[in-house]
Amino acid sequence: MTLFLPFPLILFILFTLGPAMSEENSLTIHGVTDTLGEDDEQYADALQTAGDVFAEVEALFNDENYESRTGWFKDESNDDGDIVYAKDTSNGRMVTISTELPMPPDFVMKETWEGMETLPEWNQNINFAGVVASPTDNFDIVTYGNNDVLVVSGREFVSARIWRKVDDGYILASRSVKIPSFKSKHKGKVRAHLHIAGARFRPNPANPGTTLTDVVMLAELKGFLPKMIVNQVIGRIMLMDTVTNRSHFRALKEKRDKNAN
């Protein structure tokens, strides 16, 4: 038996089904479209997850209450003037910090994005780090693990990252994803869940050549850690990473300045 469909109906089906299939494999944010090739279609869900978390991170940074820290409380601080603010959410404690990095935003963004695999070389809290897949220039899948920090044993993360140039700066966002084809090489490490991680890099009008940096994070560490313990240490861990990150960029600036002479 021959199945016949009128040509107008065929066009209707192609029109309705075709775009829906392609939309799953592409994402447009701020006029830039990430499109997955055939070999990377397994990352379609991760791409959409990255888009979701980017929207959340951008909305958070643009919220006037974030700028004034309304609804946040002072969690940790140090003698350098760094302050970690926190707020409790249904998914756990969210923490944020703002700092100045001694390099311009273009450099900071490039180093943050491309320097993933070198993290263990200069960050004592990182045990391993690598790129699982890099389907587009603005979207990738990464894995990393931290060493034992304070009372928290090492955790492993697998997350999608995405970035965009926004105005004269950048926004980078990340969230944990499940990649069926990914097999961890680090047995025994608890797989933590990154609900939201984001960074905003902006030029500093008061100090040209430097970058105003805002970082926000909300992670569920899993395992058998009591919530009270997690809340006590998560801000301190962010503070430690901020100091380490700033020292890293200072070293890169010194190297750049030395090579320029």
Regions found by a protein language model. Name each.
Residues F4-P6, I13-N261:
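Eukaryotic helix-grip
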